[in-house]
């Protein structure tokens, strides 16, 4: 059967309609059958609605998402002139544009580089060497097809190898931008993996010393290797501040993805940041309390600082583990942290905290927090921690549960 339907200036020719459904009234049309299980037209809206059947099937094909794959080398060197990024985008509608998005470690802004087409489905662009540094980067591709549907690739997170003297403590994002002051114990760490992390035997009589302190037993040992994610106690008696750099070893900047830090011991552990920009630490999607020792300013006061959940490059931190092998998650980008913690960002008016601070001429203790939280319980719970151990002379704030 062939029929012609005329209505307000448009023509629809159909064949083999298995049945018609409903009466035509008020300038409306509804056809039910093999071609369009439901084809309806409402004169008031000047539109056609397709529901199932052949027309709907064809329409569904054009709405299928783009198949998008990207290709970047797993390991990149800062000495390269550029880094080639390639994307293969397969879409029945054709691709209107492809853009490479780049985010440098520690940066909020996203750089966008238009990609050029090699053929109908392959796109390419080069990342300039000016973006290759110890902070590393992550990248992803966004394509738009001819129907303006958008597709987003997975993140590419390469390892970045850097040369000697590229990793420096006197960086603006460092805990010690002016170096470590003299005659004070401070915790230091290296925010990258050194391929040769050997430490020479040190002695304070010779000018400086490194120690690994077991905070459970109180035992002090001299380390012989720098390990990423671990911090060390350091003291020197030179006239000038000490600034560390990787002058004897090339290194690797870790991929910019969630990084796991394993706490070896039950109780207090010493950790450092594996990244050369500030990062946030979580445990079970909740912020972790980290404590560093002393401030690196002219006051030269010693003691435990206020708790934080942010790891700053080159510093070391004490963190408490409820059990050996507990794993912390290091989040490399703030936007990821915001997404993960969106539900926990609401402030409950019944919750409160108070930081108790004690300071003398040469010593301080800012480590104690009291308060009320929905995650807390009456009596001892996971939020309660024993006092941090003391080093040499000190002042301290002490509290007791139910005391």
Across the structure, where does each feature detected by a protein language model lie?
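N-terminal exported-region signature
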Residues: 8-60, 162-403
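Glycan-association/targeting regions that enable binding to alpha-glucans and other polysaccharides
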Residues: 59-175
